[in-house]
């Protein structure tokens, strides 16, 4: 089974970018609540 590196990178970025964005918002919200 051939692994498409570009497809893998695109998928990783598509998942990681929104996750990192939400994580930053979550951390800021928790910090404000304190």
UniProtKB/Swiss-Prot annotation:
GO terms for cellular component: chloroplast thylakoid membrane; photosystem II. Keywords: Chloroplast, Membrane, Photosynthesis, Photosystem II, Plastid, Reaction center, Thylakoid, Transmembrane, Transmembrane helix. It is a single-pass membrane protein. It is found in: Plastid, Chloroplast thylakoid membrane. Pfam families: PsbM (PF05151). Its main location: plastid. GO terms for biological process: photosynthesis, light reaction. The chain crosses the membrane at residues 5-25. HAMAP family: PSII_PsbM. One of the components of the core complex of photosystem II (PSII). PSII is a light-driven water:plastoquinone oxidoreductase that uses light energy to abstract electrons from H(2)O, generating O(2) and a proton gradient subsequently used for ATP formation. It consists of a core antenna complex that captures photons, and an electron transfer chain that converts photonic excitation into a charge separation. This subunit is found at the monomer-monomer interface. Belongs to the PsbM family. PSII is composed of 1 copy each of membrane proteins PsbA, PsbB, PsbC, PsbD, PsbE, PsbF, PsbH, PsbI, PsbJ, PsbK, PsbL, PsbM, PsbT, PsbX, PsbY, PsbZ, Psb30/Ycf12, at least 3 peripheral proteins of the oxygen-evolving complex and a large number of cofactors. It forms dimeric complexes. This is Photosystem II reaction center protein M. It comes from Aethionema cordifolium.
């Amino acid at each position: 089974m051939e692994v498409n590196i570009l497809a893998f990178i695109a998928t990783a970025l598509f998942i990681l970018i929104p996750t990192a964005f939400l994580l930053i918002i979550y951390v800021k919200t928790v910090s404000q609540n304190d």
